[in-house]
């Protein structure tokens, strides 16, 4: 299953809720302000780092660049472009958006 998170983890608890409910092996794609959850050295970075042992974590590269955090993305987070987003949606049987 593909889970998308579009809210900043510093504004809403969407990322926490996603991590608590996603099943092991799921893909988590951080988009829009959700990409702040992929940055290192923050209050949520340890939680996301731990989650990467159970999930594959992606961030939408255009959103990362737009927000000026490309140099702060954690090791292990895979950056994808819009075509990669489409591929993830096609590869997974279901998509859950966490708002």
Predicted feature locations:
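Structural motif
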Residues: 5-8, 62, 99
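Charged helix-capping and loop-helix junction motifs
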Residues: 41-47, 79
């Amino acid at each position: 299953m593909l889970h998308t998170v579009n809210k900043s983890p510093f504004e809403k608890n969407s990322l926490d809720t996603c991590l608590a409910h996603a099943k092991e092996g799921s893909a988590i794609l951080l988009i829009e302000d959700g990409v702040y959850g992929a940055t290192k050295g923050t209050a949520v970075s340890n939680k996301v780092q731990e989650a990467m042992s159970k999930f594959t974590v992606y961030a939408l590269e255009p959103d990362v660049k737009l927000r000026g955090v490309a140099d702060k993305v954690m090791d292990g987070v895979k950056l994808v472009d819009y075509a990669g987003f489409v591929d993830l949606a096609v590869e997974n049987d279901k998509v859950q958006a966490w708002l």
